[in-house]
Amino acid sequence: MRLNTLSPAAGAKSAAKRVGRGIGSGTGKTCGRGHKGQKSRSGGGVRVGFEGGQMPLKIRLPKFGFTSRRALVTAEVRISELAKVNGDVVDLNALKDANLVTRNIQFAKIVLSGTIERPVTVKGLKVTKGARAAIEAAGGKIEE
């Protein structure tokens, strides 16, 4: 095999459709767009979700729910990731310093996923029941 003999596999590349090149090509004159109408025009076509004037499904269905603004600034931290935190005290600033959460995060919750070997003190963070049990089993403690 040489660089000058490399080529795509047979049938892997199809030739571009050449339109407007005569009747015999199959895509002459109207170029496969048919006659007249919105879709035949340059830049023609309908927007996404348009149903021809019928009330669209998106509008027929009721609104529901909302986007919690608190959820945007809340993060989950796995218990196994606490090993990356320097020191024995884990708080929001320690998580930010260890790059476990981004700078805009204001609230964090520690969840049970993985294991923890060293004892740590968790301050000012929410902790799930399972994570609380695992931290205390490792000799750590949780301070509200």
Swiss-Prot record:
Family: Belongs to the universal ribosomal protein uL15 family.
Subunit structure: Part of the 50S ribosomal subunit.
Keywords of the record: Ribonucleoprotein, Ribosomal protein, RNA-binding, rRNA-binding
Function: Binds to the 23S rRNA.
GO biological process, one term: translation
GO MF terms held by the record: rRNA binding; structural constituent of ribosome
Residue ranges, annotated region (Disordered): 1-49
NCBIfam families linked to this entry: rplO_bact
Gene that specifies this protein: rplO
Lineage of the organism: Bacteria, Pseudomonadati, Pseudomonadota, Gammaproteobacteria, Alteromonadales
Pfam families: Ribosomal_L27A
Gene3D superfamilies from the UniProt entry: 3.100.10.10
Species for this entry: Shewanella sediminis (strain HAW-EB3)
Keyword Protein biosynthesis: no
Coiled coil: none
Protein name: Large ribosomal subunit protein uL15
Compositional bias of kind Gly residues: 21-31
InterPro entries to which the protein is assigned, alphabetical: Ribosomal_uL15, Ribosomal_uL15/eL18, Ribosomal_uL15/eL18_sf, Ribosomal_uL15_bac-type, Ribosomal_uL15_CS
